[in-house]
């Protein structure tokens, strides 16, 4: 769990600050809060900088500006995630493209012509959670291939030993 830096500084102030009593007077009592205030401002600046970098790198869909701009950004994000589909209905051609089903040409023949918005929806494929699954399948296939190569090498070694004994 990550705790914000200003919270940690305030906690440090409350728990670790020296107690000023009757017998204990600090000659620089006025400078200590100003130092802490400066440190707190620096921590807030660095935190804003870090969070803005995180937002830019890992969370492009988070709202950053005015509510009016969010609608345009959502449309741009949707356009970035969609790809024109192939004419044959296969989609992106990847391993998960069989999950996207399009109506056959026979179904289109009986219907009247549809407006452009509906036909555009059928020709675009939207990325979903299939992408990480496809990547995992590729990694599993690579691991299986390495395992098979290792077994084949071990079998070849055994066959060579058997051939020497005869």
Curated annotation (Swiss-Prot):
Alphabetized Pfam families for the sequence? CRF
**Residue ranges under compositional bias (Basic and acidic residues)?**
41-51, 113-123
Q: Tell me the Gene Ontology biological-process terms attached to this UniProt entry.
A: adenylate cyclase-activating G protein-coupled receptor signaling pathway; cellular response to nutrient levels; digestion; hormone-mediated signaling pathway
Write out the propeptide range(s). Answer: 24-123
**Any single GO CC term annotated in Swiss-Prot or TrEMBL for this entry:** extracellular space
Q: Which GO terms describe its molecular function?
A: corticotropin-releasing hormone receptor 2 binding; corticotropin-releasing hormone receptor binding; hormone activity
Q: Which UniProt keywords apply?
A: Amidation, Hormone, Secreted, Signal
Please state where this protein is localized.
Secreted
Query: In this chain, where does the modification Isoleucine amide occur?
Result: 162
User: Which residues lie in Acidic residues bias regions?
Assistant: 68-77
Cleaved signal peptide residues: 1-23
User: Is Secreted among the key words of this record?
Assistant: yes
For the region Disordered, what residue ranges are annotated? 41-123
Biased composition regions of type Gly residues, renumbered to the chain: 86-96
Question: So which domain of life are we looking at?
Answer: Eukaryota
Q: Please give the function described in this protein's UniProt entry.
A: Suppresses food intake, delays gastric emptying and decreases heat-induced edema. Might represent an endogenous ligand for maintaining homeostasis after stress.
What interactions and quaternary structure are annotated? Binds with high affinity to CRF receptors 2-alpha and 2-beta.
Give the PANTHER family listed for this entry.
Answer: UROCORTIN-2 AND 3, UROCORTIN-3
Family affiliation: Belongs to the sauvagine/corticotropin-releasing factor/urotensin I family.
Q: What is this protein called?
A: Urocortin-3
State the species of origin.
Answer: Bos taurus
């Amino acid at each position: 769990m990550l705790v914000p830096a200003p919270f940690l500084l305030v906690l440090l102030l409350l728990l670790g600050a020296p107690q000023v009593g009757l017998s204990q007077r600090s000659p620089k009592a006025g400078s200590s809060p100003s130092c802490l205030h400066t440190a707190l401002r620096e921590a807030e600046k660095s935190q804003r900088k870090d969070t803005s970098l995180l937002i830019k790198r890992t969370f492009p869909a988070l709202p950053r500006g005015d509510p009016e701009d969010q609608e345009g950004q959502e449309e741009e994000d949707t356009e970035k995630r969609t790809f024109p589909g192939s004419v044959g209905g296969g989609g992106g051609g990847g391993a998960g493209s069989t999950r996207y089903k399009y109506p056959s040409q026979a179904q289109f023949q009986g219907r009247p012509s549809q407006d452009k918005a509906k036909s555009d929806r059928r020709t675009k494929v939207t990325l979903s959670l299939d992408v990480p699954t496809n990547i995992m399948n590729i990694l599993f296939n690579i691991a299986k291939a390495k395992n098979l190569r290792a077994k084949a090498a071990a079998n070849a070694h055994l066959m060579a030993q058997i051939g020497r004994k005869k």
